[in-house]
Amino acid sequence: MFMQAFRAPFPATSNNVCSAHADGCDGASVKPIPDFAVIVPMHNEEASVGTLVGEIVAACRPVGDFEIVVVDDASSDGTVGAVLSLADDYPMLRLVRHDRQGGQSAAIHSGVQAARAPIVCMLDGDGQNPPDNLPTLLGPLLSATAPQRLGLVAGQRVGRRDTLAKRLSSRFANQLRARILKDGTRDTGCGLKAFRRDAYLALPYFDHHHRYFPALFSRDGWQVAHVDVTHRPRLHGNSHYTNIGRALVGIYDLIGVAWLLRRRKRSNWAETFITETSP
């Protein structure tokens, strides 16, 4: 059984994809396009891999054909080995590897580039986003009656299982962002989101852009839906972020996104077909 995998210089490029165990491209094969892809960014999450992948598979099997794209953001522990060890049990599992750490937005971007499905869902690799929420996120986008311009379904956490300091800082940041960007989102930091792949790839790409998906999708004329999702403590290890570090970066990001929204020029177009007429 082969695992689909590739090692990519950061940022990843889609033409690096091969179907192979580890990094080689021997035994390449073409598989049918799945209905949706689940992107899981990971950095030093060795202890969480097995449980999280198993939960994703259990949640997604009733929904449709899918692939799981784990993006290893240059982990220094055994995350890669833990993913490779699951290859025989989960043929839908793929592995993308950064050659140097790029952060969560870079990992999401690489995963979406590598994904083959038209609909993409993402969740954090630390296990705090319970995978049983995935069908709720995917349902509106996979429905036969889905609105044509529905581009993003964003999760909003209910009953967050974080420290008091983290919850308070997040609440302040969300209120400030909502006031400035007017994106109608209560919890833009939630890692559970589902979206159209083509819509995502047309967004401006920058570090930390995953925190501003509702505003960015709306900027491009897409409809955004929100659903409540559950939350739980990390499965293992500690957070890779600090409240102070996130706040300092967030100020600059917020200013930049506000500038992007103001500078957006949108116009509707339609092609007029010209037919040849006889002289």
Located regions from the model:
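Hydrophobic helical membrane-anchoring modules
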Residues: 2-33, 182, 207-279
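Conserved sequence signature across two-component system core domains
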Residues: 42, 71-73, 98
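Conserved donor nucleotide-binding strand/loop of the catalytic core
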Residues: 66-69, 80-114
